[in-house]
Structures are given as C-alpha cells and as structure tokens.
C-alpha cells in the first residue's frame, strides 16, 4: 500500500495544519449553528428578514452537524470519511452565505464567508486526497 502524504515527514505538517483548520471550523460552525437553534425566533429573524425562522433553524442544524463532522470522526477514529463530506457540505453553506452577504452588505460583507468557504474547501480536499484520516485499524478510507 502506498503511503499517503499525511504519513510522510512533509505530510505531518499538513496533517497538523488540517487539524488546526478543522478545530477552528468546528468552533465557528458549532457556535453559529447552536445560536441559530437556541435564539428565540424573533431575535433570529431580526437581522435576516428575508428568511423564515424555520429555514434559519435548518441552517443551524446543518452548521452544527458540519461542525461536529469536522472533529468527531477523527477524534473517535470511526467513519473518518465523513470529515471531507462535512467540509464539502460547509462549502455549500458558505456559497449561500456569500451570496446573501454580498446582496446585503456588498463585497466587504462577503469576505468572511468567502474565506471560511476556502478554508473548508482546503479541509475537504486535504482530508479526501492529501492526508486522509485513518480509522481505528489504521486504514485510510
């Protein structure tokens, strides 16, 4: 079996970089997602009047699950193939967030979701191809 980049000395740095980005994304999306789930509906729709509270709660669920998907599979060493899928799902969320932010606030408002989406895309590709996470048996899926 050929070694993946994550198993080489050069790949160790990539592995740690990906983990750092995964933890940061997890914290960001867990915070954003949980806030959308626990805030009262009136507060939730104050800033974003174009979306219903139910839709924003759905986005909160997606963000929370995506945040968990960034770290739990790697920490538990099970279903590690879910991490790049979670990151790819968060890229889709950030594409939508970029469009909404651009419409509401212009280019300055769209910068944060663009950068977040790029980081999530890097994690998705990195964990899919460059340095996949091994499962408990050491197998890379």
Tell what function each PLM region has:
Residues 2-141:
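Membrane-interface extramembranous regions
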């Amino acid at each position: 079996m050929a070694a993946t980049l994550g198993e080489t000395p050069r790949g160790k740095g990539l592995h740690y970089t990906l983990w750092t980005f995964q933890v940061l994304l997890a914290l960001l999306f867990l915070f954003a997602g949980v806030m959308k789930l626990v805030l009262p509906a009136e507060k939730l729709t104050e800033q974003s009047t174009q979306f219903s509270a139910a839709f924003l709660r759905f986005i909160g669920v997606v963000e929370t699950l995506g945040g968990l998907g960034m770290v739990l599979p790697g920490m538990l060493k099970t279903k590690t193939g879910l991490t790049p899928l979670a990151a790819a799902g968060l890229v889709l969320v950030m594409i939508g967030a970029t469009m909404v932010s651009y419409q509401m606030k212009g280019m300055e408002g769209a910068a944060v979701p663009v950068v977040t989406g790029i980081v999530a895309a890097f994690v998705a590709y990195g964990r899919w191809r460059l340095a996949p996470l091994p499962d408990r048996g050491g197998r890379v899926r």
